[in-house]
């Protein structure tokens, strides 16, 4: 459990922590000299039962507020300190505002230096503090009157702090730690410290270090200042890491991550909680975990807005950010991440804003996935990063019925039905426009119907429609069940002359027309009708094989694929006993219809179900 102190400068935060834990959290010589916390200090309070509550002593001076903001990410509780001699001060209010804007952690209040004033002043400050607590939504906070130097109120405060519940951290989330310090230890090497926002880490794990963008191995761990083999979210962690990185390359705001991250984000949609109204395209200081950048805000509708960062940030859904004015003097608002990497255009369309509002209301990973699926296919890798879900978390999520998955893409049933309707409409239009053709191949149908959608999902839907009988297939050509063709009387007569001439070799239209004494265009239309009926197949325009020969060729390709792992033109030519040009025409036909796919000079078996096996 981590507890962050908060409060105005010189109100006794560090002294109070020393009285609780016996540790002086000021770690810099300048801090000890000035009696003022400048950077983050840490103190740990080991208990007989093995628990080790940890304290982050954050600076109270306005000048060092960015350091304070680096300390409040990922905390379970906060301890607000108000001196009885000063009462509520500027940073008291600002720290309360920041705590409110970073997720409302459970709050405890200590009134310090009670030995320096009379009881009337203590009562006055107590009333003052309760009023400001109500103002910022912390009316339920427990309040203790203390004097650290003489021990007043310390036993009751310690007992209360030990009874605070620890926040539950879900096991299905990936490990993510924001680095706030890096140093070297003689005999151990590089050590980084920070607060884990999610997940679990073990000695021996490989983690990705942003900044240097390299993998690092965890050699040793300390959690809450104790050596351990495993550490979890919500703990203060020191990691001894090994890899190709030096201390000087690591900065506050870098991350250690369980997985290789996507590119950091320059734009996000957020839900705002404002203390001071923001203006369109207002420049801001933006704080996230241990990171601090500048950027601007684009207001959308109600409390939704887009943040645009001058320096990209690694963010995830529901991450909290604090927005301060460009002079870095006033805290203006908090922001919760609703969507990563939004589209550059169309964000102000009413239907899109309505969808964003639904996404902002999502209470769980399952809710968020359901909302995303309303708009179309979801990339599972992107979603897993956004929600910081590990493999276990994603598997649990995908067990819900009604999802259609192909590779790393997911679709829900209503959108799949819309896509299938589009596929059928496209096929009907194709038949209307090409009455003398059997139909398009799978790839061509995909490109005509849904060219911008995920390829694997569209092909999977086409296959499901073929299996269900909504679409029929003849040797790679797809058509609607009622799309049938018949010969006219003239074509029937031509076909009766042409059919006996089809042996094992292919025919060109012009050669067959000449052989039978038929007009070339009439022969061309007749052979197209024969192809539409599944009797013959054109491997290229105007060159036809009997369909049983096409099936034989498909079986040859299967055999070569089993023997060699693929089919090349030379092997196929030798197996078939034809010229290289014809062999290539046949192989390219199989590529076009999706039975094979080309990779360099090889043709790999892609869809073995298109043709019956021998």
Curated annotation (Swiss-Prot):
It comes from the Bacteria. Residues 57-60 are annotated as: G3. GTP binds at residues 7-14, 57-61, 112-115. Disulfide bonds: none annotated. The keyword GTP-binding applies. Residues 1-173 form the tr-type G domain. Residues 35-39 are annotated as: G2. Residues 147-149 are annotated as: G5. Keywords: Cytoplasm, GTP-binding, Nucleotide-binding, Protein biosynthesis. Residues 7-14 are annotated as: G1. It is found in: Cytoplasm. There are about 1100 copies of SelB per E.coli cell. Translation factor necessary for the incorporation of selenocysteine into proteins. It probably replaces EF-Tu for the insertion of selenocysteine directed by the UGA codon. SelB binds GTP and GDP. This is Selenocysteine-specific elongation factor. It comes from Escherichia coli (strain K12). The gene is selB.
